[in-house]
Every structure is written in structure tokens, then in C-alpha cells.
Amino acid sequence: MEVVRYFTRNQKQLPATGPNDSIVQLPDIPPCYECNVEVALRFDSSLDSEKLQQSLKQLLEIGNWRQLGGRVRRRDTNPSACNYDLHVPAEFTTERPAFNYQIWELSGAIDEHPTASKMPRPTDPKKVSFYNVGDARSPLRTRTRYPRKAQEWADSDLPPLSFEQLSFRDGTIILLVFPHILMDATGYGLFLKAWTSVLQGRIDHVPQCCGFSESTTDMLGHKTPAGAFTWHNHLLKGLDSLKFTAGLLWENRWGKEDRVIRVPAKFIMHTRDKVLADLSTSQPSPFVSQSDVLIAWFTRVVLAALKPLQRRTLVLTNAFDTRHMLPPERAYLQNSVCMAHTMLPVGEVLYNPVSFLANEIRRSLVRERTEEQIQARCAWAKDVGIMPLLGTSDMLLCNVSNWSKGNLVDLDLCHAAVTEHRGPCVPSSILNCSQMGGVTPNYGIILGKDSQDCWWMQWHLPKFCWAGIERELDTINQIRWE
């Protein structure tokens, strides 16, 4: 009911703070984090909603995990500031619960439902699969009207963790919703892992949770000066920033759409073997990961379909986790990612083989994941802004976020299965339903690897380029690469 009350009351009336609420100051965040993260998971088993809710309640009474039930509040009345707090109730009650959980009972089969049936499912593991998911995303994310931005959460008294369960005769869809100011994908993955530990009766496996008031970047220290940051002289500002914004507006004029691509394990292994063979002619012990190859291969496919001027600069940003720098005994849920930048002329990327871009992506990650570079980046960002824009005024910006470390594909809810379940009960489909809003650059999400080691990706690109991408994928499927 709190969801309904939020959208029917006077928006200018701010919610009262509970007299015994504990106030937790969230680290400052850039404006791009003020959106929601909304993810739909399909399970091919009926799940017991009571077991799922009881295990959630149990988790959110353990130590700092309770902070996930806090209410978002704006710390600064300045509307341009991105400073928020969590007001954590001393006790979670029916009126102020630790989380919101909506249940929709549907009597039919999951594949008979007009929306659920359109979520991407594994098909031929030997072919690159292509899914148009526009019709599947909208109905899932609009069934309940949650706040969409951090300020809307601050105007409500809703708990930031929200779940919607669509229960069918033979399956379940769970929509996970949370404000991005709280966590990144890896942090949410740590939360889900703790949840399943409680669900399985293994409370002793739940790690200590780091409080949200502790900034992971501050934990790393600031011993390295800002000038040591690799890209410190590539800040986009002034007229160059205006030119880039105008160009981005122009490129968004036709609108953008999402597609999901499933890439066979053997294709990536074959491509990686070829990349390593190419690199071995100039390097003694070359290394690139499967995700390096995946991003490099598909970025070249995207560039070929977009047909940008070859003199433009491709700026490929690749999100990486900084938790490897922190003590391992605690779970760090808060946003803890930085962006590795690869800047190359478009023509150079298209002229050279996949190995060229894959190697540059790996070099960027190796260079920017060091403790010194992360410290320098944080010091530099404090000088020029929390998340400054790097690149050139004519750049083609492409952002990539790798959710594979969040392990969404491994979320095992077998202990909540209504009927006896042999083996794990993991998602058969994952769909990002988040709404970025406004003008956005091109971006892709690596959703993870499934049980057949096939990679799943979801990309947000201009509508006009998808036909060319689909033709290229069809061509690839005609080639014998096993």
C-alpha cells in the first residue's frame, strides 16, 4: 500500500523521519547513479514466496545488512547535489517494512503469458542467438509504479529493496528493483548470495556487511597525486563538452532499442585462440580474457553497423571492480567500480583484426586497475568532479558494464521450489529492465555465462543499426568455427 500512497499523495510533503531512525551517510555519487537498477529473472519452477520473504526478513536483521532497509533521504536541499542518506528504522514493522514484496498469482503456464513468453530463452548452443526484447521489458517494469530516481525514493518512505513475483503454474518471474545509489551489480550479487545462504539454512556463511557510510574509494587512501592519473589531461570541458553533447543529441534522434545476444562458448573460445595466436607473433606470453574478446568482437560489429566517420575517436569504457583491493572478510555492497578507458581511432579499430582491440582493452584494464591508478583517479575526480567525462569532442562513446561477477546466472533458489527440485534452480533468462531516461550513449551489459558456458549480453544502440548487426550475426552462423 505504501507504493500506492506514494503516487497519490502530495509530492511536496516530505516523509517524516522516525524518531529512532539511525542515519547512515551514503558516499557522494555522480548523477548517473540516480536511476534504478531493475532486473527480471525467469525460473522454470514454481517458487514459494513465503520462504523467499522469510529468508529476506532474517537476512535484513543481521548486523549492517539492516541498512538495506533504510529509507533514502536527501542530505542537501540543493537540487543539483547528489548527496543522500539512509534512515534505518529501529524496528521493521508492517507500516515500515524492511523491503517491499509484491506477489501476482497467475493461473496459466508461463509460456502462455504474453510478456513472460517473450523473455529470451536458450536456443541452439552452436549458434549466435539474437533476441528483440522490447515487448518483454515494458510490461514487466510497469506492473507496479516504483520511484524511478533517487529523488523520488527520497520523497517516499519506501524501502529501497523491492521485489515483484509473478507466479505461474509451472514457473516464476522475479523482478528485482533497487536505486543505483546503493549498490552496483557486484554488490547486489553479494546481497543475493547472502540471501540464498539464509534460504539454505547456512546463516554462518553470511559475511559481515560493510556499512554504507564507508566509502570504498576512501578505504584505498589517496597517497597518489591526481596528476599521476593516466587520463588526467583528457578531461572534456567547455566548448568541447558542448560539442560532444550536441553530437550525442543528434545521434539519439532516431531513438535507441535494446537487444539480447547469446554467444556460444565455442565461438568465443575459437575467437580467443585466434586472438592469442595473432598476439603471439609480437608478444612472448600474451593474455586476453574471454570477456576482452567478447567486447572487442562485438564492438567491431557495432562500429560496422553504425558506420561512423573513421577519423572519429572510439572511447570504450569498461567498468571494473575495485573490491580486489579491499580486505576480503567483509561484503562491500556500495558502488565500487571505476572505468578503464580505451581510446582509438575508429578506422584503426575496423582496419585491424579483433586481436588489436582485445589487446588494447586488456592493456587498459591492466594499467588502470593498479592501486596507484585508482588512488590517482579518485584524487583527480575530487578535483574536477565525481565522474568527469573523458575523451574528445567528436568521440563515439561506448560504455560496457560486466555483470558476470554479480553471478545472477548462478542465483540458486532450489530451497524455495514448491515441488522437489533436482539440481540447482537458477534463472533460465535474465533481462535488464532499467530505464536510463534522457539522452544516453551506446552501452552494453555483459549479463554473464549460463550453464552451457554461453555468454549473454544486452546492448542499447540506435534503432537503425540493429538490422546490420543481425545480418552480420547471420553471416557468422553460416561459418563453421567449431
UniProtKB/Swiss-Prot annotation:
Disulfide bonds: none annotated. Its EC number is 2.3.1.-. GO terms for molecular function: acyltransferase activity. The keyword Acyltransferase applies. The active site is at 180 (proton acceptor), 412 (proton acceptor). Gene3D superfamilies: Chloramphenicol acetyltransferase-like domain (3.30.559.10). It holds the Pfam family Transferase. Pathway: Secondary metabolite biosynthesis; terpenoid biosynthesis. PANTHER family: FAMILY REGULATORY PROTEIN, PUTATIVE (AFU_ORTHOLOGUE AFUA_3G14730)-RELATED. Belongs to the plant acyltransferase family. Monomer. In A.calidoustus, the austinoid gene cluster lies on a contiguous DNA region, while clusters from E.nidulans and P.brasilianum are split in their respective genomes. Genetic rearrangements provoked variability among the clusters and E.nidulans produces the least number of austionoid derivatives with the end products austinol and dehydroaustinol, while P.brasilianum can produce until acetoxydehydroaustin, and A.calidoustus produces the highest number of identified derivatives. This is O-acyltransferase ausP. It comes from Penicillium brasilianum. The gene is ausP.
